[in-house]
């Protein structure tokens, strides 16, 4: 990575991970030019995490996030909002990430057309979720991008940016090139 960064005009090198090995590799990733790490984390509840990851240890993820932050790597949490699984944790996730000054992006469940698995039962409209959260946080839209389709907001009640990716209720392909 380090040699690639020196030969490119990239402003940022970003990596996406589940975070389980981040503690071990955070320092080396920073030394090799990684500026930001997106951590896929759909819950901060240990029991739910264990269930969704099939016996994963959320403490390893938390330790990895802390190690990355200690090495001055920006972190963004990506959370797929899943009906009857984590929809009741949204405010807790906002507060947890705000306390750590970590940006957070909520993502709608997307259909998996290449599989036989229907995910419609997991769907929650992020447009509806945003409306509910906006009543609490009074969001202000900001001109910020991480190179993807998320719409970002801030609030006087939080220290971080909150993003929303809504492929179904707000077709993000409308802004694709």
Language model: regions and residue ranges:
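Radical SAM/AdoMet-radical enzyme domain recognition
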Residues: 1-105
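Short secondary-structure boundary segments
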Residues: 41, 108, 166
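Glycine-rich beta-alpha junction loops
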Residues: 81-85, 108-113, 169
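Accessory C-terminal segments flanking Radical SAM cores
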Residues: 113-177
């Amino acid at each position: 990575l380090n040699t690639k960064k020196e030969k490119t005009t990239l402003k940022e090198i970003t990596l996406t991970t589940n975070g389980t090995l981040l503690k071990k590799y955070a320092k080396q990733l920073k030394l090799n030019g990684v500026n930001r790490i997106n951590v896929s984390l759909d819950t901060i509840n240990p029991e739910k995490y264990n269930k969704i990851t099939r016996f994963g240890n959320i403490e390893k993820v938390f330790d990895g996030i802390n190690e990355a932050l200690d090495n001055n790597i920006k972190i963004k949490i990506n959370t797929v909002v899943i009906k009857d699984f984590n929809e009741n944790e949204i405010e807790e996730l906002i507060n947890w990430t705000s306390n750590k000054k970590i940006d957070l992006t909520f993502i709608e469940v997307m259909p998996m057309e290449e599989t036989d698995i229907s995910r419609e039962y997991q769907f929650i409209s992020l447009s509806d979720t945003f409306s509910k959260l906006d009543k609490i946080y009074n969001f202000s839209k900001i001109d910020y991008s991480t190179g993807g389709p998320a719409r970002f907001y801030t609030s006087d009640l939080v220290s971080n940016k909150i993003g929303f990716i809504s492929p179904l209720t707000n077709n993000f392909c409308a802004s694709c090139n």
